[in-house]
Amino acid sequence: MTAHYVKNRLKYKKLIILFFNYGQRTVKQERYFSKKCAKNLNAEFEEAILPELKKLSTSLLNSNVKAKTIKRNQLKNTSKESLKWYVPCRNLIFLSYALALAESLYIKNKEKYGIFIGFKNEGKEFYPDATSKFIEQINNLQKTVTNKGIKIIAPLINKDKEEIIKIGKKLDINFNETYSCYSGAKTNNIHCGYCLSCRLRKEGFYWSGIKDPTIYAKK
């Protein structure tokens, strides 16, 4: 979604889709849709492999434990369930890598890149490394660690999932080519339908008033 927004709304011409493989259970599906996104936007695709992050992680994303079935009435307080899926300092690690890549590209090709990340408004139950404050702090840090001032931008950070879906509709995004599932299914285009992320995806479409085209293994 963010890549489409950057290309088609912000009118950036040259994009690199940077995909991170850190041993997450949905790596196959995420890679598939990231490559599809890169192809659709005529962007480069680059994969960064970070095996050590899996060793550090306490997240269910890096395990084979079955995801808990989340019901609609449980969405009022998802803090405990969210914590189970949180990968400690993941976004800091990802952005550090992205900064190193952007700095290297400038040194090599004299091409200056901005870094865009797909944070959204998480409300009260936010991850500590997915906030406006975090973006502000890491932008302050990059002024010290890079020579050319590579700005990090989260263009949709003040939008909730419902608003983002509406923006996606205006951008004519094929939502069947987006992926949210934490649990993963046997085929790339199927979401489990019961994990926290799938439930939030369903709610986003419901409140946006836009038909959800997603194929769920469990309704």
Where are the regions a protein language model picked out?
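Short amphipathic alpha-helical interaction/hinge segments
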Residues: T146, Y206-G209
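Local cysteine-cluster metal-coordination motifs and their immediate loop/turn environment
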Residues: S96, E177-E203
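Perimembrane helix-loop junctions in membrane proteins
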Residues: I107, G204-W207
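ATP-dependent adenylation/nucleotidyltransferase module used to activate substrates
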Residues: M1-D172
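Short cysteine/histidine-rich metal-coordination sites, predominantly Zn2+-binding motifs
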Residues: G209-K219
